[in-house]
A protein has these predicted regions:
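Conserved N-terminal segment of class I S-adenosyl-L-methionine
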Residues: 1-100, 106-108, 122, 229-232
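S-adenosyl-L-methionine-dependent methyltransferase catalytic module, highlighting the catalytic core
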Residues: 5, 12-23, 50, 117-124, ...
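A structural micro-motif
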Residues: 64, 86, 133, 181-182
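Active-site loop signature of alpha/beta-hydrolase-fold enzymes
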Residues: 74, 96, 115, 142-145
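A short SAM/SAH-binding and catalytic strip from SAM-dependent methyltransferases
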Residues: 108-117
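Short loop segments at secondary-structure junctions
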Residues: 238-239
Length: 239
């Protein structure tokens, strides 16, 4: 998920920031899949596979050929436990050397691009996506008053490993247009933090399926807003 130049051990991060599985998937992504003919699907920076797990559980990827890449070897091993038919590879999203040119019909990248060199990443994505292919992209958008309790380079940040948090649309739109993409959807929604997540992570729960327990699922509905921080979702088409 991260470029190697970041001063963090990728496997340490994978163990310290586990992703838990549930059937929750972004509504905009589900809408995009409904309108797309099945083909080659790539989860770009897949992490532990929480998104792929939800998509598989809801049968959103039937008849799709599924691939996934992440920089962490341990996370790629977990992907193969979700479904051994997923073509899961250790790769850098800034390069995508394991992905052939113009081979992907739908590429998904959720909360990844803020961790990496966005210019290199968009160039790599543009190379592997087919003409008329789609991208579902989500990232962090921060208002001037946004605050969270992590700090990086003297600033309050949502995640201390973020290289950047976008605060103007043109910071990303310039890359989108210069790499030959059209914007089909552009949405922002306030981030809400499930209170239960804090206790789950604090307790170091190892079971990735922990969120599927009914009581935990109900408790996760208790959420607090993260003021000034938005989930920025984009659906793009390669021209």
């Amino acid at each position: 998920m991260f470029q190697k130049s970041i001063m963090i051990d990728i496997e340490d991060y994978a163990s310290q920031a586990p992703q838990y599985y549930s059937e929750n998937i972004p509504g905009l992504l589900e809408k995009t899949l409904v309108g797309q003919r099945p083909g080659n699907f790539l989860d770009c920076g897949c992490g532990d596979g929480s998104l792929l797990y939800g998509l598989k559980k809801k049968k959103c990827l039937e008849n799709w050929k599924i691939s996934a890449i992440d920089l962490s070897e341990s996370r790629i091993r977990r992907i193969k436990l979700i479904d051994p038919n997923i073509h899961a590879m250790v790769d850098n999203v800034e390069v995508l050397h394991t992905v052939p040119d113009q081979s992907v019909d739908l590429l998904v990248s959720t909360q990844v691009i803020e961790h990496v060199d966005d210019k290199k990443t968009f160039q790599a994505i543009s190379r592997v996506l087919k003409k008329d292919g789609r991208i579902y992209l989500s990232t962090v958008f921060k208002k001037w008053y946004g605050w969270y309790f992590y700090r990086n380079n003297g600033r309050w940040v949502l995640d201390p490993t973020h290289l950047r948090e976008y605060y103007e649309e043109n910071q990303l739109m310039g890359l989108i247009f210069s790499n030959g993409f059209q914007v089909l959807e552009n949405r922002k929604s306030l981030f809400w933090f499930p209170v239960a997540d804090f206790f789950v992570r604090w307790a170091g729960v190892a079971n990735r399926n922990f969120y599927e327990k009914k009581i935990v699922s109900l408790l996760r509905r208790i959420q607090v807003p993260i003021l000034g921080y938005y989930n920025w979702e984009l659906v793009l088409k390669k021209l």
